[in-house]
Amino acid sequence: MSQVYNFSAGPAMLPAEVLRRAELELCNWHGLGRSVMEISHRSKEFLEVAHQAEQDLRDLLNVPENYKILFCHGGARGHFAALPLNLLGEKTTADYIDGGYWAKSAADEAEKYCSPNIIKIKTEIDGKIAVKPMKEWQLSDNAAYVHYCPNETIDGIAIHEEPDFDDKKIVIADYSSAILSQPLDVSRFGMIYAGAQKNIGPAGLTLVIIREDLLGKARKETPSVFDYTVLAENDSMFNTPPTFAWYLSGMVFKWLKEQGGLQEIAKRNYEKATLLYSAIDNSDFYINRIATENRSLMNVPFQMSSPALDAVFLKEAEEQGLVALKGHRVSGGMRASIYNAMPFAGVQALVDFMADFERRHA
């Protein structure tokens, strides 16, 4: 079978080495005569998987000891609700930074539980979409926390700054599409959460990294499966966790360490994104509407000067093994998601195809 490069925004491409290893182990994991999908989450064997996955993740992100790592159900959308239920405490408002589709979705969900202070940060620079720098965010004094999304998967907008607010501010970030793409100072955040299906592993698992002093504040009506204190006290096994997704995510963590860690991964991601954005910027046929300083390194949306060619582009791209390039229904056009698992060769193949398509259709 010819090479296929999967540019899906999620569920996304997984490292080929991880998939090959999983294939070898699928039916007879560690000589047990069973798949890892069939063993108890409380067995000695799976507890070793869980412990190693957590340790490898701690190593990759240099997670401080006063942070708990939770492997949860629910997807990021589930945690849009779990977050206010766990962290509002006695307060009735939280700051929600609206920088794109997913940040706004989190704020919309929070309205069920509080009165969010929605801070719009989108602006324009020379006709391009940008976001205001953090120093211009008008944060409130009485908010329980500040929530933002550093990488907007649909919009292709990134906030590359790390928070540097007053020490009293509890900063929460939805890192679903940027987690593990570069080094990160976890200590600047009260909590980070991320759906696994983009840069961690298969769909069905959600990662939560939360500072210990934020536990124990959940409202009494919080479902137990979404109570971070309950999950922490039970080592993420209050109910049966998504064991196969946990196992595969652990393999991805190990793969990232084998590649040289997040410094090396960040270098590769920058090189891939630079190649693709350069191809777009040097063309009159392709258009990216995001200001350079706020472009995502993970999700690159682009349109063609003639939208009537979209279907032709997608069909021909798929014939060349370049799949899942259709843009989100909200934004249209094309979108290339180039997460950690996407090799440079995949982006090069896309750029070569784009140049050839332009020659034939411009």
UniProtKB/Swiss-Prot annotation:
The note on the cofactor says:
Binds 1 pyridoxal phosphate per subunit.
**Can you state which reaction this protein catalyses?**
O-phospho-L-serine + 2-oxoglutarate = 3-phosphooxypyruvate + L-glutamate; 4-(phosphooxy)-L-threonine + 2-oxoglutarate = (R)-3-hydroxy-2-oxo-4-phosphooxybutanoate + L-glutamate
So, what pathway does this thing act in?
Amino-acid biosynthesis; L-serine biosynthesis; L-serine from 3-phospho-D-glycerate: step 2/3; Cofactor biosynthesis; pyridoxine 5'-phosphate biosynthesis; pyridoxine 5'-phosphate from D-erythrose 4-phosphate: step 3/5
Q: What is its main location?
A: cytoplasm
Q: Which residues form a coiled coil?
A: none
Q: Which residues carry this modification: N6-(pyridoxal phosphate)lysine?
A: K198
UniProt xrefs under SUPFAM superfamilies: PLP-dependent transferases (SSF53383)
Q: Which residues form the signal peptide?
A: none
Q: What's the EC number here?
A: 2.6.1.52
InterPro entries given for it?
A: Aminotrans_V_dom, Aminotrans_V_PyrdxlP_BS, Pser_aminoTfrase, PyrdxlP-dep_Trfase, PyrdxlP-dep_Trfase_major, PyrdxlP-dep_Trfase_small
Question: What are the alphabetically sorted keywords of the record?
Answer: Amino-acid biosynthesis, Aminotransferase, Cytoplasm, Pyridoxal phosphate, Pyridoxine biosynthesis, Serine biosynthesis, Transferase
What top-level class of enzyme does the UniProt entry assign? transferase
Which Gene3D superfamilies does this one have? Aspartate Aminotransferase, domain 1, Type I PLP-dependent aspartate aminotransferase-like (Major domain)
Might you report a single GO cellular component term?
cytoplasm
What GO biological process term is on the record, naming one? L-serine biosynthetic process
Where pyridoxal 5'-phosphate binds, per the record, is at: A76, R77, W102, T153, D174, Q197, N239, T240
Location(s) in or outside the cell: Cytoplasm
Top-rank taxon, per record: Bacteria
Q: Name one GO molecular function term.
A: pyridoxal phosphate binding
Subunit: Homodimer.
Q: What does this protein do?
A: Catalyzes the reversible conversion of 3-phosphohydroxypyruvate to phosphoserine and of 3-hydroxy-2-oxo-4-phosphonooxybutanoate to phosphohydroxythreonine.
Which HAMAP family does the record cross-reference, listed alphabetically? SerC_aminotrans_5 (MF_00160)
Recorded family membership:
Belongs to the class-V pyridoxal-phosphate-dependent aminotransferase family. SerC subfamily.
| UniProt-recorded name of the protein | Phosphoserine aminotransferase
Lineage, opening ranks: Bacteria, Pseudomonadati, Pseudomonadota, Gammaproteobacteria, Enterobacterales
Whichever gene encodes this chain, its name is serC
